[in-house]
């Protein structure tokens, strides 16, 4: 079990498509395990829903509206006791363009 004094890498992932996000998480966890690091996660965070209300008509009829929604799915992966091999392997990892990645050391 990880202790408080160990070094860790925290990776935050965001995407609109949850399937793309889960495959990216699996790639990161597999890469960390291959380099003898200890991955914890992926931990799902709450999904952010943004709802936009738009009038359907360009002029009148304010009663007629349309709603659009974007959902942002988020995950966190913690990697404990990383080595230089772990960091190199994570940097070389090819992830899809639809996934936003934040890395904190």
Swiss-Prot record:
Source organism: Synechococcus sp. (strain JA-2-3B'a(2-13))
Keywords: Ribonucleoprotein, Ribosomal protein
Protein name as it appears in the record: Small ribosomal subunit protein uS10
Organism classification: Bacteria, Bacillati, Cyanobacteriota, Cyanophyceae, Synechococcales
InterPro entries given in the database record: Ribosomal_uS10, Ribosomal_uS10_CS, Ribosomal_uS10_dom, Ribosomal_uS10_dom_sf
Keyword match Ribosomal protein: yes
Function field: Involved in the binding of tRNA to the ribosomes.
Assembly: Part of the 30S ribosomal subunit.
GO molecular function, one term: tRNA binding
GO cellular component, one term: ribonucleoprotein complex
GN (gene name): rpsJ
GO annotation, biological process: translation
